Curated annotation (Swiss-Prot):
InterPro entries: Ribosomal_bS6, Ribosomal_bS6_CS, Ribosomal_bS6_sf, Ribosomal_S6_plastid/chlpt, Transl_elong_EF1B/ribsomal_bS6. This is Small ribosomal subunit protein bS6. NCBIfam families: S6 (TIGR00166). GO terms for cellular component: cytoplasm; ribonucleoprotein complex; ribosome. It comes from the Bacteria. There is a cross-link at K33 (Isoglutamyl lysine isopeptide (Lys-Gln) (interchain with Q-Cter in protein Pup)). One of its GO terms (biological process) is translation. Binds together with bS18 to 16S ribosomal RNA. GO terms for molecular function: small ribosomal subunit rRNA binding; structural constituent of ribosome. Keywords: Isopeptide bond, Ribonucleoprotein, Ribosomal protein, RNA-binding, rRNA-binding, Ubl conjugation. Belongs to the bacterial ribosomal protein bS6 family.
Length: 90
């Protein structure tokens, strides 16, 4: 899950996320789904913002690749928060 700066235009969110998702594809992983929830109210302010643009991304990749994606997202100033969760294997 990624929470982006609410001042971004919502139409530019998906193309800007694609640049980060290329890290997954380049290392042999797959991007299963990108679900942009849109602008939502935050439970508490983050960097003086009361809202954020939420995006949920489902990927299959090696742990090192996911760590690199998380690192690059955290370096971007338009990303307020990231949360990486591993799903259970079925």
């Amino acid at each position: 899950m990624v929470i982006l700066d609410p001042t971004l235009d919502e139409r530019t969110v998906a193309p800007s996320l694609e640049t980060f998702l290329n890290v997954i594809r380049k290392d042999g992983g797959t991007v299963d789904k990108v679900d942009i929830w849109g602008r939502r109210r935050l439970a508490y302010e983050i960097a003086k913002h009361a809202e954020g643009i939420y995006a949920v991304i489902d990927v299959k990749a090696e742990p090192a690749t996911v760590s690199e994606l998380d690192r690059q997202l955290n370096l971007n100033e338009s990303v307020l928060r990231t949360k990486v969760l591993r799903t259970d294997k079925h």
